Amino acid sequence: MEEEGEAQGRAVPGGRLNMSHGFVHHIRRNQLARDDYDREVKQAKEKQKKRYTPGPTRQKKPDLQVYHPRQREKAHTTETLKDEPNDNGTQLFCLDFEADGGEVTSIIVYEDDDAEQLATMISNQNQLEGDMREALKQRIQEEISKRRVQR
């Protein structure tokens, strides 16, 4: 008998746990209850009517500022450069003068225009030196005379 008493205090030779205390039973019951509760909550969420409710309106980010380059100045015509447009002469050609800075000056040249007057206007507008003004005057005079002959 003494051996039986010692056997009760020690582990049983089969190596099994003594489940008579009920501790694992309570853990198992809690796990099942938790699973059931989770399942019910999930089903209730699915049954709930899905409706569109607009959320609170968030403020939009302000539009990004976009760089818009300046428009190049419109081509200058005789109407903008002269006091009065010359309507009584026939139009010979359009003179486009491009300065060193890339600015283009356009002038409509008429048959009775003065080459020196045109060269002076262009040189004043583009700050040309005297030599350049003289060369421009000669070139304008050549073009005017060449086109007068063609007509």
Curated annotation (Swiss-Prot):
Q: List the biased-composition ranges (Basic and acidic residues).
A: 32-46, 70-85
Spell out where the chain crosses the membrane: none
User: What sections of the sequence does the record tag as coiled-coil?
Assistant: none
InterPro entries this protein is in?
Answer: UPF0561
- State what protein this is by name: UPF0561 protein C2orf68 homolog
Q: Which domain of life is it from?
A: Eukaryota
Taxonomic lineage from the root: Eukaryota, Metazoa, Chordata, Craniata, Vertebrata
| Pfam families according to UniProt | UPF0561
Could you say which protein family the record assigns here?
Belongs to the UPF0561 family.
The ranges of region (Disordered) come to 1-89
